[in-house]
Amino acid sequence: VDENAEDTHGLCGEKTCSPAQVCLNNECACTAIRCMIFCPNGFKVDENGCEYPCTCA
């Protein structure tokens, strides 16, 4: 198993990432996915400040 591979679900090191995050090198990081839809109130944001992809607030 490649420990540096990106994982989009499950445990990330010692914790679980939110749906707005990806696991990269055993660290939760904001996803780089950006959506071209207009959200009048912006995108939904998790407790870490990461935007949920294509999900309006």
From Swiss-Prot:
Cellular component, GO, one term: extracellular region
Subcellular location: Secreted
InterPro entries reported in the protein's UniProt record: Antistasin-like, Hirudin/antistatin, Prot_inh_I15_antistasin_leech
Keywords recorded for this protein, A-Z: Disulfide bond, Protease inhibitor, Secreted, Serine protease inhibitor
S-S bonds: C12-C23, C17-C28, C30-C50, C35-C54, C39-C56
Keyword check for Secreted: yes
Tissues where this protein is expressed: Not found in the saliva, but in the body tissues.
Major localisation: secreted
PROSITE patterns listed in its UniProt record: ANTISTASIN
Coiled-coil parts of chain: none
Domain of life of the native organism: Eukaryota
A single BP term in Gene Ontology: negative regulation of coagulation
Domain Antistasin-like: 30-56
Site residues (Reactive bond), renumbered to this chain: M36, I37
Annotated GO MF terms: serine-type endopeptidase inhibitor activity
Function: Inhibits mammalian elastases.
Stated family: Belongs to the protease inhibitor I15 (antistasin) family.
This protein's name: Guamerin
Species of the source: Hirudo nipponia
